[in-house]
Design a protein with these regions (language model features):
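Regulatory and interdomain segments flanking nucleotide-handling catalytic cores
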Residues: 1-254
Protein backbone atom coordinates (compact mmCIF):
# COMPACT_ATOMS: atom_id res chain seq x y z
CA UNK A 1 0.00 0.00 0.00
CA UNK A 2 1.46 3.33 -1.04
CA UNK A 3 2.15 5.76 1.78
CA UNK A 4 1.13 8.98 0.03
CA UNK A 5 1.20 11.01 3.25
CA UNK A 6 4.69 9.83 4.15
CA UNK A 7 5.95 10.45 0.63
CA UNK A 8 4.55 13.97 0.68
CA UNK A 9 6.17 14.82 4.02
CA UNK A 10 9.51 13.40 2.86
CA UNK A 11 9.39 15.67 -0.19
CA UNK A 12 9.11 18.63 2.18
CA UNK A 13 12.21 17.42 3.97
CA UNK A 14 14.11 16.94 0.73
CA UNK A 15 13.64 20.61 -0.18
CA UNK A 16 16.04 21.60 2.61
CA UNK A 17 18.34 18.59 2.45
CA UNK A 18 21.25 20.54 0.97
CA UNK A 19 24.63 18.93 0.33
CA UNK A 20 28.10 20.33 -0.23
CA UNK A 21 29.85 19.58 -3.49
CA UNK A 22 31.96 16.46 -3.11
CA UNK A 23 35.79 16.52 -3.03
CA UNK A 24 35.95 20.16 -1.90
CA UNK A 25 37.53 21.18 1.46
CA UNK A 26 35.00 21.88 4.21
CA UNK A 27 35.40 24.05 7.29
CA UNK A 28 33.23 23.41 10.35
CA UNK A 29 33.31 26.11 13.01
CA UNK A 30 31.82 25.34 16.41
CA UNK A 31 31.16 28.11 18.95
CA UNK A 32 30.19 28.12 22.59
CA UNK A 33 26.79 29.71 23.20
CA UNK A 34 26.86 32.71 25.55
CA UNK A 35 30.22 31.68 27.01
CA UNK A 36 30.74 35.13 28.51
CA UNK A 37 27.93 34.29 30.93
CA UNK A 38 29.02 30.66 31.23
CA UNK A 39 32.53 31.59 32.40
CA UNK A 40 31.05 33.86 35.07
CA UNK A 41 28.72 31.14 36.35
CA UNK A 42 31.53 28.59 36.52
CA UNK A 43 33.90 31.17 38.06
CA UNK A 44 36.66 30.74 35.48
CA UNK A 45 40.02 32.30 36.27
CA UNK A 46 40.70 35.59 34.47
CA UNK A 47 42.25 36.43 32.09
CA UNK A 48 43.15 32.84 31.09
CA UNK A 49 41.79 29.68 32.67
CA UNK A 50 44.07 26.73 31.95
CA UNK A 51 41.36 24.21 32.84
CA UNK A 52 39.00 25.73 30.27
CA UNK A 53 41.74 25.93 27.63
CA UNK A 54 42.66 22.27 28.16
CA UNK A 55 39.01 21.21 28.08
CA UNK A 56 38.45 23.05 24.79
CA UNK A 57 41.64 21.55 23.35
CA UNK A 58 40.57 18.04 24.34
CA UNK A 59 37.12 18.67 22.88
CA UNK A 60 38.80 19.64 19.61
CA UNK A 61 40.82 16.42 19.66
CA UNK A 62 37.68 14.37 20.32
CA UNK A 63 35.96 16.00 17.33
CA UNK A 64 38.95 15.31 15.08
CA UNK A 65 38.91 11.66 16.13
CA UNK A 66 35.18 11.21 15.59
CA UNK A 67 34.45 13.20 12.43
CA UNK A 68 35.28 11.31 9.26
CA UNK A 69 37.65 13.15 6.94
CA UNK A 70 38.87 15.64 9.55
CA UNK A 71 42.58 16.32 9.06
CA UNK A 72 43.12 19.01 11.71
CA UNK A 73 41.47 21.28 14.23
CA UNK A 74 42.23 24.69 15.68
CA UNK A 75 40.96 25.91 19.03
CA UNK A 76 40.92 29.40 20.49
CA UNK A 77 38.76 30.76 23.31
CA UNK A 78 35.32 29.06 23.01
CA UNK A 79 35.72 28.40 19.28
CA UNK A 80 36.77 25.27 17.39
CA UNK A 81 37.57 25.11 13.67
CA UNK A 82 37.86 21.81 11.80
CA UNK A 83 39.09 21.11 8.28
CA UNK A 84 37.54 18.14 6.46
CA UNK A 85 38.95 16.61 3.28
CA UNK A 86 37.24 13.85 1.29
CA UNK A 87 39.43 13.79 -1.81
CA UNK A 88 42.29 11.55 -0.64
CA UNK A 89 41.34 8.85 -3.17
CA UNK A 90 38.45 7.78 -5.38
CA UNK A 91 36.95 5.60 -2.63
CA UNK A 92 36.87 8.31 0.05
CA UNK A 93 33.36 8.83 1.40
CA UNK A 94 32.36 12.24 2.82
CA UNK A 95 30.99 12.54 6.35
CA UNK A 96 27.20 12.10 6.24
CA UNK A 97 27.44 12.33 2.45
CA UNK A 98 28.14 16.07 2.90
CA UNK A 99 24.58 16.69 4.14
CA UNK A 100 24.83 20.12 5.72
CA UNK A 101 22.08 19.75 8.33
CA UNK A 102 23.60 16.51 9.59
CA UNK A 103 27.12 17.93 9.70
CA UNK A 104 26.27 21.02 11.72
CA UNK A 105 23.83 19.31 14.09
CA UNK A 106 26.02 16.30 14.88
CA UNK A 107 29.26 18.32 15.22
CA UNK A 108 27.56 20.67 17.70
CA UNK A 109 26.14 17.67 19.57
CA UNK A 110 29.54 15.95 19.76
CA UNK A 111 31.17 19.10 21.13
CA UNK A 112 28.39 19.63 23.69
CA UNK A 113 28.50 15.98 24.79
CA UNK A 114 32.26 15.76 25.27
CA UNK A 115 32.66 19.18 26.88
CA UNK A 116 29.91 18.63 29.47
CA UNK A 117 30.94 15.02 30.16
CA UNK A 118 34.49 16.13 30.97
CA UNK A 119 33.71 19.40 32.72
CA UNK A 120 35.65 19.30 36.00
CA UNK A 121 34.77 22.82 37.18
CA UNK A 122 33.52 22.97 40.76
CA UNK A 123 30.57 25.19 39.80
CA UNK A 124 28.71 23.10 37.23
CA UNK A 125 26.81 24.77 34.44
CA UNK A 126 25.81 22.99 31.19
CA UNK A 127 27.48 24.41 28.09
CA UNK A 128 25.93 24.59 24.64
CA UNK A 129 27.59 24.81 21.24
CA UNK A 130 26.36 25.81 17.81
CA UNK A 131 27.96 24.96 14.49
CA UNK A 132 28.24 26.18 10.92
CA UNK A 133 29.86 24.61 7.88
CA UNK A 134 31.01 25.89 4.51
CA UNK A 135 33.33 25.00 1.66
CA UNK A 136 36.56 26.84 0.84
CA UNK A 137 39.02 26.67 -2.07
CA UNK A 138 42.15 24.67 -1.25
CA UNK A 139 44.36 27.76 -1.40
CA UNK A 140 42.20 29.56 1.16
CA UNK A 141 42.39 26.91 3.88
CA UNK A 142 45.54 28.48 5.30
CA UNK A 143 43.97 31.94 4.98
CA UNK A 144 41.00 30.80 7.04
CA UNK A 145 43.21 29.61 9.89
CA UNK A 146 45.37 32.73 9.70
CA UNK A 147 42.18 34.80 10.05
CA UNK A 148 41.00 32.86 13.10
CA UNK A 149 44.43 33.00 14.73
CA UNK A 150 44.62 36.76 14.26
CA UNK A 151 41.27 36.99 16.01
CA UNK A 152 42.64 34.76 18.78
CA UNK A 153 45.64 37.03 19.38
CA UNK A 154 43.48 40.16 19.31
CA UNK A 155 41.10 38.63 21.86
CA UNK A 156 43.99 37.44 24.01
CA UNK A 157 45.46 40.93 24.18
CA UNK A 158 42.07 42.41 25.07
CA UNK A 159 41.44 39.79 27.78
CA UNK A 160 44.79 40.51 29.42
CA UNK A 161 44.24 44.26 29.27
CA UNK A 162 40.69 43.99 30.63
CA UNK A 163 42.03 42.16 33.69
CA UNK A 164 44.09 45.26 34.53
CA UNK A 165 42.13 48.24 33.19
CA UNK A 166 38.54 49.42 32.99
CA UNK A 167 36.64 49.41 29.72
CA UNK A 168 36.74 53.20 29.81
CA UNK A 169 40.55 53.23 29.92
CA UNK A 170 40.73 50.75 27.03
CA UNK A 171 38.23 52.52 24.80
CA UNK A 172 39.55 52.98 21.23
CA UNK A 173 42.97 51.56 22.18
CA UNK A 174 44.78 49.50 19.54
CA UNK A 175 46.23 46.08 20.30
CA UNK A 176 49.75 47.54 20.39
CA UNK A 177 48.63 50.21 22.83
CA UNK A 178 47.00 47.60 25.05
CA UNK A 179 50.21 45.55 25.05
CA UNK A 180 52.16 48.61 26.18
CA UNK A 181 49.59 49.37 28.89
CA UNK A 182 50.01 45.81 30.21
CA UNK A 183 53.79 46.27 30.17
CA UNK A 184 53.30 49.39 32.29
CA UNK A 185 51.65 47.10 34.85
CA UNK A 186 54.58 44.69 34.69
CA UNK A 187 53.07 42.03 32.39
CA UNK A 188 54.40 41.50 28.87
CA UNK A 189 51.85 39.80 26.60
CA UNK A 190 54.69 38.63 24.35
CA UNK A 191 56.07 36.48 27.17
CA UNK A 192 52.84 34.54 27.77
CA UNK A 193 52.66 30.83 26.86
CA UNK A 194 51.98 30.37 23.16
CA UNK A 195 48.58 28.75 23.62
CA UNK A 196 47.40 31.84 25.52
CA UNK A 197 48.41 33.99 22.54
CA UNK A 198 47.87 31.84 19.46
CA UNK A 199 45.50 29.00 20.40
CA UNK A 200 46.00 25.23 20.11
CA UNK A 201 46.32 23.04 17.02
CA UNK A 202 45.28 19.39 16.72
CA UNK A 203 46.70 17.17 13.99
CA UNK A 204 47.82 13.62 13.26
CA UNK A 205 51.33 12.73 14.35
CA UNK A 206 53.15 9.49 13.66
CA UNK A 207 53.42 7.18 16.64
CA UNK A 208 56.72 5.55 17.59
CA UNK A 209 54.88 2.26 18.14
CA UNK A 210 55.42 -0.04 15.12
CA UNK A 211 52.63 -2.11 13.59
CA UNK A 212 53.75 -5.35 11.93
CA UNK A 213 51.71 -6.88 9.12
CA UNK A 214 51.39 -10.56 10.11
CA UNK A 215 51.20 -11.66 6.47
CA UNK A 216 53.85 -9.54 4.74
CA UNK A 217 56.00 -8.62 7.73
CA UNK A 218 55.91 -4.98 6.67
CA UNK A 219 56.26 -2.40 9.42
CA UNK A 220 54.12 0.71 9.54
CA UNK A 221 53.42 3.39 12.13
CA UNK A 222 49.98 4.45 13.23
CA UNK A 223 49.13 8.15 13.31
CA UNK A 224 47.26 9.62 16.27
CA UNK A 225 45.74 13.04 16.79
CA UNK A 226 47.78 15.12 19.20
CA UNK A 227 47.28 18.54 20.79
CA UNK A 228 49.99 21.11 20.08
CA UNK A 229 49.81 24.01 22.54
CA UNK A 230 53.13 25.48 21.47
CA UNK A 231 52.23 26.70 17.99
CA UNK A 232 53.58 29.93 16.57
CA UNK A 233 51.98 32.36 14.14
CA UNK A 234 50.48 30.64 11.08
CA UNK A 235 52.20 31.88 7.93
CA UNK A 236 52.70 31.11 4.25
CA UNK A 237 55.76 28.91 4.72
CA UNK A 238 55.94 25.15 4.05
CA UNK A 239 57.56 24.58 7.44
CA UNK A 240 54.56 26.08 9.24
CA UNK A 241 52.75 23.22 11.00
CA UNK A 242 49.39 23.79 9.33
CA UNK A 243 51.01 23.92 5.89
CA UNK A 244 52.81 20.66 6.65
CA UNK A 245 49.48 18.97 7.39
CA UNK A 246 47.91 20.33 4.20
CA UNK A 247 50.86 19.19 2.09
CA UNK A 248 50.60 15.68 3.58
CA UNK A 249 46.98 15.61 2.41
CA UNK A 250 47.87 16.72 -1.13
CA UNK A 251 46.38 20.20 -0.72
CA UNK A 252 47.77 22.85 -3.05
CA UNK A 253 48.91 25.80 -0.96
CA UNK A 254 49.96 28.48 -3.38
Amino acid sequence: MQDSLGDRIKRYEECSNYKFTNRVPIIIRIDGKAFHSWTKKTKCVKPFDSNLINLMSNTTKYLCENISGCICGYCQSDEISLCLINSQNNETQPWFDNRIQKMVSVSASLATYYFNSNNMFEHKCPALFDSRAFVVPEKDIINYFIWRQRDASRNSISMLAQSMYSNKNLLKKTSDEKIQMCKDKGVDWNNLPNHFKYGSFVYRNQSNEPLVNKITGEISYRKHFIIDQNINVFEYKPECIINTILIENNIKLF
